[in-house]
Amino acid sequence: MKRLTLGDVCKKASSNIAQKDLQDKIGAYPIYGASGLIKQVDFYQQDKEYIAVVKDGAGIGRTMLLPAYSSVIGTMQYLLPKEGIPIDIKYLFYAVEHMNLAKYFSGATIPHIYFKDYQKEPINIPDIETQRRISRIFDKIDALITSRKEQRTKLDQIVKSRFIEMFGDLADPACDWPQSKLTEVCADPDDIKCGPFGTQLNKAEYRHEGVALWEIPQINAQFRVEPTHYLDFDKAAELDAYSIIPGDIAMSRKGNVGQCAVFPCDYMPGIIHSDVLRIRVDSGKMVPIFMMYQLHYSGTVKRQIEQVSSGAIMAGINVTKLKSIMVHLPPLELQEQFADFVTQIDKSKYRQEKCIGFFQCLEKSIRQEWL
């Protein structure tokens, strides 16, 4: 096995194609950008399978293995194997992906990376048959991960179908479930509350342990990822009005506005971040899991949330107005039946997550050993 550098085994090539120039181009050849396929055009720049790296802007350092007879736009860069060095393109792709090229970024406004910097990355080059064998192993692991993710998506679709089956289309004018203001399904108006302002909590008060501070990334992951920041117990007690306890619904009020998750029953109470909004429903009127899915699936509720969100640069929910949005109140027994169904589906999703995590750890271990 040879230990070389990326620059020893491949060369760069540039694209001068701007996405704005593709509007009138129609054909059979794919052209790609940082987010994937843009469209089919009537030309191509590469006639062999190749690697593309995002070199400018969002997604910088992301690596793609792309087909022959295709192209990329100017924010990406081609990596092409050099002649005379036997190398499997898939092996090269997995090796480059493992390098985490984003660490070479520079530029504050528009980040970018340069081949002259990352070409120094070391790469193991075994014989060609070993390269192909390693590539096949990674292909199989990736296929298993993709399959599990697809199963997880199907489980989400099953929950949505069950919601509609049990409660109908809540946006339909013919829907006859009683309605109530959101604040009226809470025991107290202050049960709907956004996190503490910067004057009440600043970053200097963050700790590495203590009481968890729950932020938007954790909500987006349905609380399946660990908190990044903590508060000491005295500070948490001072901010008790902004607590989150099992059964509370946490909602992002900035960025991905309206994304929400129910705080798990086996978690210790924490504090919500200023970008997070807490909804603590009265369990005698509304089941939290049903309420969360109503926030996700009801077209009527989603439109109301859009109306109470404002901001020219970044939307943010107006909490006072949110308290007055109208929600549906099906019989509590029906809500509980739906919540029980979701609990069973969540167990299946958890098993899929564990499998995905296992395969990802396996892949990482193999990359560290072989690449």
Pin down the residues of each PLM region.
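Short hydrophobic-aromatic micro-motifs
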Residues: 30-33, 39, 51-54, 78, ...
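Non-catalytic DNA-recognition/assembly elements of restriction-modification systems
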Residues: 1-17, 21-33, 120-136, 146-147, ...
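Short, ligand-facing micro-motifs at secondary-structure edges
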Residues: 17-21, 38-54, 58-71, 89-91, ...
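Sequence-specific dsDNA recognition surfaces
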Residues: 7-48, 64-66, 71-74, 183-203, ...
